[in-house]
Structures are given as structure tokens and as C-alpha cells.
């Protein structure tokens, strides 16, 4: 009997050959090769390019790349080179298809499309054909031109893109050969060749009369709306608008390049295409072997044909005969004196500079007279009259406030009106509020901000009207009102205009601590960040009735708080805008430099008007201004 653990005799000799050989080295080599294979596969998938023809072309315009790419026949090169600069514009949903086309006009990702296509979209995305396939980028409105149905978008990215140069207006003549591009619902590019039919054509869109348009038969589908019309050099002749004519057929219009440059060169530094004398033929010899390609590209008007290997639908509106591309017919060039010529300073016309200065002056006067409302007027004016988006407005207003309220803080500190022991605990809350408000404002979008701004102005107008209707709101000037007669902050401000009255503090008492500091500092920052206003209209009443201090001290303390909140807002707006590719520092800094002098001078004028004009007149002007802002902002939604 064998018990557990016992063995009978000697164990047999190990005859397994594998265990007698060295196996670790080959297995290690095999494992390493497998790892390298998988790593290489992952790298290839990550760096896969559907079309490597455009490597190194990020900083080039279409025209520049077209000259460099000479391997294909001339028109085939055009059809192959233009589509990467043509984008689809749609909503922000994952499965949202394009509602219009667009054209990339700046290497940093600026896109021009039609305003009516994006005005009602809560979110905007841009679909771009890259070497790695179609990519989707979120975008924001930078500026709008309602009179020409244009919207300038900025993709939220710091990447570089192939883009268009702007065609020289002198080369645009009736009969000129052009190509209208777009992207269809599937994101595939489409193009039709045609001719410029007429210049300076009008188009009525609802109640808006659009002028200075080109007519072209190259536009045949709504999918080309917002897309580029280009010439044979690949330069942007204009942005397409597809309209339904009286017969129900699509009629093609184009907002020409000189209109685009005139209205948007304050934000984008456009590249200019090479000029060709009008009436001179542009002969391009087509390379040998292109006959077969043209036989594939030709199609009946209205029936696009896909070009094998190019993924593009081409409609041949005017068939090219022979081996030579058509020349430009002789004719009078399109001269647009309304948008071409004139002095430009930093990309701004003299008229635009005067308009911006006058807006800043009016905002300064309003703020100087009533110590509130100036920021509301500045933001609303930049949105309505100049079409700027909040991404550009906020850093401009913040920079303006830094200078204007910085100077006011120094004056108030010199007059010993700033209560530093009360202000210092509020500064962190004001900074936190403006940062939080900035991101909230970005999240809700410009349309919601416009509504909030209109409602805010409406409330301020109603408040002023109620005070006008009070029995004691007569025709007195600031000097004739005593502090005891001043029952609200507006009347009290008039009593303080001569600097002699010091009203008794009154209001709601809150215990000292973080909660009190938050109540006094956070709301001002939130309103400033969301709406882009200074926030003084919120802070002064809070300082007065919650802080229980006199109006003089409330105004002085508020100026310091607005200054530091604006400094923080400027830093956040520039850092966030630059890191996400939304803004570049040149545009907001230039705008601020234009507007700061007007705002500063306007504040001085407004302070003097407060001392000499009757109270009823001051309140009436203020109420009318706020009511006009509310009406415009709420009806333009």
C-alpha cells in the first residue's frame, strides 16, 4: 500500500526538448515585434490622410496653392483645390446637417456665410474637409452685416486652414467666367461653371433690400447659398445667395468681394488676389490628356454628374470648347465707389471710426449724467449698429472700463471717497462674478444676451419714468435740490452734483462676513460678465442700500470694484479667446483704442451736464435712451 506523499523508485529523466533550449530570447523578440506592429497600426490610423495633396498648405490661399499645384489641367486643378476652403454650416447637433455653405477667408479659421442661414441657430458648427476627412468645429458669430446678408464666423480652434484671397474688383466684368461652389446635405462638394451676367443687381429679401450684388448663372441650387463664387485664379469673387425667382426657378446672386472687404476688414486681414486688366484674355493651355476628364465633367444644366475619384458634383453651365479655357469677354469693369477707395486706418474707414467714437461718446455722456446706463448703450450699439458679436464686444468693453474706471478710481481715491476697508473684501467676489458671468454669457449665446440686455434696459427705462412722474421731480437743477428732498439714488445724485451734500446712509443691514461681501460684490461681476456692461448700475444701489453708505462713497467704491472686475474680465476674455481661437488680440485692442477717448471725454461732459440740466430733463433723456435700446434689442430677436 502506497501512502500519500510516498514515491516508488526514481523519477524518469526529463525528455521535453523545449525546456532544454533557450526560449526567452525568441519570445521576447516576437513580443516586441507584435508590440511594434500594433503601435504602427495605431499611428497609421491616427495619422491617416484621405488626401495628402494639401500637406503644408495651411498658410496658403487657394490661389497660391493653385499656382503651386501644376500637375493637372487648369480647370481640373481649380476643381480639386477649391473644395477644402468650402465648408458646410449647420447646427451644433451631432447629426445636424449643413443648412448652408461657407467660405474660409482667413488662415485662422474665419468663415463667411449668409446671415439668414445662421441667424436662428442656437449653436453653429462648421464642417471642414481636411486631409483626415470631414471634421466638425464649433463656431461663433463675430460680426454680422444685415444689409448685405453676411455673417462672419470664427471656428473655435487654433488650427490653420487653406483659405481664399479676395478677387480684385477691377477684374469683375459681365461675361466673366466664374465657378460657384457649395456643399450638399451629405457634405460632398458641388460646383457649377457659369458667367457673371450683370453687376449692381438688387435683391429684396423680406423687408431688406440688398444692393451692389452680382448676377450669375453659376448658382443653381440652395446648397450653394453662402458658398464662394471664384474666378479662374481661385480668388473669391463673392458669397452666393440662391433666391427663388418669379418662375419658381433658382436665381443666383453674389455679394461681391469689395463689399465683404469693406465691412469685415476691421476683424479679418484679407489677402488680395492678383489683378488682371479687364477685357484682356486669360488664356490657359490645357495639358494633354485632359479630353477624357472633360468628357466626364460635362453635364446638362440641372443634372450634376459625379466625377469619379474626386467626390464632386459638377454642373457644366457653359461648355468649354477646344483645349483652351474661355477668355474674359471685353466689357466695363464693375466699379463700386461705395465700398472701394477712401482712407483706411487700421482696417477701419473714416466713417466707421467716427461712428465708433460717437457711440463711445454717447455712452460716456449717459454714464456721466446718471452714473449708469453707459455700458448698456455701448454694448447695444456695437451689436445693433456695427454687428459685432459678444465674443468681440466683451474684451473691448472690459478694456474701455479698465481705462475709464481706473481714472475715476484715482480721482475718487484722491478725494478720499473710496472706503478701502469696505471695498477690499468685495474685490475677490467681483472678480469671481465676472469670470463666472463671462462663461455663462458665452454658453447662452448672443441672442439670449440681446434679450437680457433689452429687458434690463426696459426695467431701467421704467424706473426712470416712475421717478419722473413723482411729484417732487420738477424742473430743478442739481444745485436746487437738498439732500432731504432726494428720495432715491437719482435725485440724491443730483443733490450731490455740487459736492456739498452728504446724505445720511440708510438701507438694509446685513452682518459682516463672507455672505455680505458676496451679496455686495458677486451680482455686479455676474451682470458685467454676462451682458458686457460695467455693472455700476447694479453695484451703486447695492453699496447704497445694503452697504448702508452714502451715495458719494457708493459711487467711489463701485468705480474701484468695476476697475478690478474689468481687469479680470480682460485677462479671461483674451486668454480664453486666444486659446480657443475665438479672437485675436489685434481686433479688440484696436476697437478699444478707438472707443476709449470718446468714452473718457463723454464721461466728463456727462458729469458737467448733470450739474446744469434740470432733473426732469436728465431723467427724460435717460428714460428715452433706455427705452430705445429695449425696443431695438427686443424687436430684433
From Swiss-Prot:
InterPro entries on file: Peptidase_S1_PA, Peptidase_S1_PA_chymotrypsin, Peptidase_S1C, TM_pro_TauE-like, TSUP/Inactive_protease-like
A Pfam short name: Trypsin_2
Membrane topology: Multi-pass membrane protein
Keywords, sorted A to Z: Biomineralization, Magnetosome, Membrane, Metal-binding, Transmembrane, Transmembrane helix
Transmembrane segments: 25-45, 353-373, 379-399, 417-437, 439-459, 518-538, 555-575, 587-607, 617-637
Localization in the cell: Magnetosome membrane
Induction: Part of the probable 18 gene mamAB operon.
Cofactor(s) in the UniProt record: a metal cation
Keyword Transcription appears in the UniProt entry: no
Signal peptide: none
Keyword Transmembrane: yes
Single GO MF descriptor: serine-type endopeptidase activity
Disruption of the gene: reported phenotype: Cells have no magnetic response but still make empty magnetosome membranes; magnetosome proteins MamA and MamE localize normally. Deletion of genes mamH to mamV (amb0961 to amb0978) gives cells with no magnetosomes and no magnetic response.
PTM per Swiss-Prot/TrEMBL: Subject to proteolytic cleavage by MamE.
Phenotype when changing residue 263 to A: Loss of magnetic response, no crystal formation when amb1002 to amb1007 are also deleted. Slightly improved Ni(2+) binding
Cofactor note: Binds to transition metal ions via His-148 and His-263, but also binds metal via other residues.
Side Lumenal, residues: 46-352, 400-416, 460-517, 576-586
Binding site for a divalent metal cation: 148, 263
UniProt-annotated stretches for the region TSUP-like: 370-637
Function: Plays 2 roles; promotes magnetite nucleation/formation and activates the MamE protease. Despite its near conservation of a protease-like sequence, this is probably not a protease. Required in conjunction with MamP for proteolysis of at least MamE, itself and MamP. May transport a solute that controls MamE's protease activity. May place individual iron atoms into the magnetite lattice.
Additional observations: This bacteria makes up to 20 cubo-octahedral magnetosomes of about 45 nm in diameter which contain membrane-bound crystals of magnetite (Fe(3)O(4)). There is a paralogous gene with partially overlapping function in the genome (amb1004, called limO, AC Q2W8L7). LimO does not encode the C-terminal TSUP domain and does not complement a mamO deletion.
Family under the similarity heading: In the N-terminal section; belongs to the peptidase S1C family.
UniProt-recorded name of the protein: Probable membrane transporter protein MamO
Origin species: Paramagnetospirillum magneticum (strain ATCC 700264 / AMB-1)
Lineage of producing organism: Bacteria, Pseudomonadati, Pseudomonadota, Alphaproteobacteria, Rhodospirillales
Name of the coding gene: mamO
Amino acid at each position: 500500500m502506497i501512502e500519500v506523499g510516498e514515491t516508488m523508485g526514481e523519477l524518469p529523466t526529463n525528455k521535453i526538448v523545449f525546456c532544454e533550449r533557450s526560449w526567452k530570447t525568441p519570445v521576447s523578440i516576437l513580443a516586441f515585434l507584435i508590440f511594434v506592429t500594433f503601435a504602427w497600426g495605431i499611428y497609421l490610423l491616427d495619422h491617416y490622410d484621405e488626401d495628402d495633396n494639401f500637406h503644408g498648405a495651411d498658410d496658403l490661399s487657394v490661389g497660391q496653392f493653385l499656382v503651386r499645384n501644376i500637375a493637372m489641367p487648369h480647370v481640373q486643378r481649380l476643381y480639386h483645390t477649391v473644395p477644402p476652403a468650402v465648408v458646410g454650416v449647420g447646427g451644433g447637433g451631432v447629426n445636424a446637417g449643413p443648412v448652408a455653405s461657407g467660405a474660409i477667408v482667413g488662415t485662422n479659421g474665419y468663415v463667411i456665410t449668409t446671415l439668414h442661414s445662421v441667424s436662428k441657430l442656437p449653436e453653429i458648427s462648421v464642417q471642414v474637409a481636411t486631409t483626415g476627412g470631414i471634421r466638425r468645429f464649433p463656431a461663433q458669430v463675430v460680426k454680422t452685416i444685415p444689409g448685405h446678408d453676411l455673417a462672419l464666423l470664427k471656428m473655435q480652434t487654433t488650427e490653420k486652414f487653406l483659405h481664399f484671397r479676395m478677387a480684385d474688383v477691377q477684374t469683375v466684368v459681365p461675361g466673366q467666367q466664374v465657378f460657384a461652389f457649395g456643399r450638399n446635405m451629405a457634405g460632398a462638394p458641388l460646383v457649377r461653371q457659369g458667367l457673371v451676367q450683370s453687376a449692381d443687381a438688387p435683391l429684396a429679401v423680406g423687408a431688406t433690400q440688398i444692393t451692389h450684388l452680382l448676377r450669375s448663372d453659376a448658382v443653381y441650387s440652395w446648397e450653394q447659398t453662402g458658398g464662394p463664387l471664384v474666378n479662374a485664379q481661385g480668388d473669391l469673387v463673392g458669397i452666393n445667395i440662391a433666391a427663388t425667382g418669379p418662375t419658381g426657378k433658382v436665381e443666383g446672386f453674389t455679394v461681391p468681394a469689395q463689399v465683404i472687404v469693406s465691412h469685415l476688414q476691421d476683424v479679418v486681414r484679407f489677402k488680395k488676389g492678383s489683378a488682371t486688366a479687364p477685357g484682356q484674355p486669360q488664356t490657359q493651355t490645357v495639358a494633354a490628356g485632359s479630353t477624357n476628364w472633360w468628357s466626364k465633367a460635362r453635364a446638362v444644366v440641372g443634372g450634376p454628374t459625379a466625377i469619379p475619384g474626386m467626390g464632386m458634383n459638377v454642373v457644366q453651365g457653359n461648355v468649354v470648347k477646344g483645349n483652351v479655357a474661355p477668355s474674359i469677354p471685353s466689357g466695363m469693369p464693375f466699379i463700386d465707389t461705395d465700398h472701394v477707395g477712401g482712407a483706411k486706418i487700421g482696417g477701419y474707414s473714416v466713417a466707421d471710426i467716427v461712428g465708433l467714437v460717437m457711440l463711445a461718446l454717447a455712452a460716456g455722456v449717459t454714464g456721466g449724467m446718471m452714473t449708469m446706463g453707459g455700458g448698456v448703450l455701448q454694448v447695444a450699439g456695437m451689436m445693433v449698429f456695427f454687428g459685432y458679436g459678444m465674443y468681440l464686444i466683451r474684451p473691448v468693453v472690459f478694456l474701455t472700463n479698465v481705462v475709464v474706471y481706473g481714472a475715476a478710481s484715482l480721482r475718487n481715491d484722491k478725494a478720499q471717497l473710496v472706503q478701502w476697508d469696505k471695498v477690499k473684501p468685495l474685490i475677490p467676489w467681483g472678480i469671481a462674478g465676472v469670470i463666472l458671468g463671462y462663461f455663462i454669457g458665452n454658453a447662452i449665446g448672443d441672442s439670449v444676451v440681446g434679450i437680457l440686455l433689452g429687458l434690463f434696459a426696459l426695467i431701467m427705462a421704467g424706473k426712470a419714468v416712475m421717478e419722473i412722474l413723482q411729484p417732487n421731480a420738477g424742473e430743478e437743477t442739481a444745485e436746487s435740490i437738498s439732500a432731504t428732498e432726494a428720495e432715491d439714488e437719482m435725485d440724491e445724485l443730483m443733490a450731490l452734483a455740487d459736492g456739498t451734500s452728504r446724505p445720511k446712509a440708510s438701507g438694509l443691514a446685513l452682518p459682516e462676513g463672507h455672505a455680505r461681501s458676496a451679496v455686495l460684490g458677486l451680482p455686479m461681476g455676474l451682470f458685467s460678465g454676462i451682458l458686457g456692461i460695467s455693472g455700476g448700475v447694479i453695484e451703486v444701489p447695492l453699496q447704497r442700500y445694503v452697504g448702508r453708505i452714502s451715495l458719494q462713497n457708493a459711487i467711489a467704491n463701485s468705480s474701484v470694484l468695476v476697475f478690478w472686475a474689468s481687469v479680470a474680465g480682460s485677462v479671461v476674455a483674451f486668454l480664453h479667446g486666444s486659446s480657443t481661437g475665438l479672437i485675436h488680440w489685434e481686433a479688440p485692442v484696436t476697437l478699444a483704442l478707438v472707443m476709449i477717448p470718446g468714452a473718457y471725454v463723454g464721461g466728463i461732459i456727462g458729469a458737467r451736464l448733470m450739474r446744469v440740466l434740470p432733473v426732469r430733463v436728465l431723467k427724460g433723456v435717460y428714460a428715452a435712451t433706455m427705452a430705445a435700446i429695449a425696443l431695438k434689442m427686443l424687436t430684433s430677436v
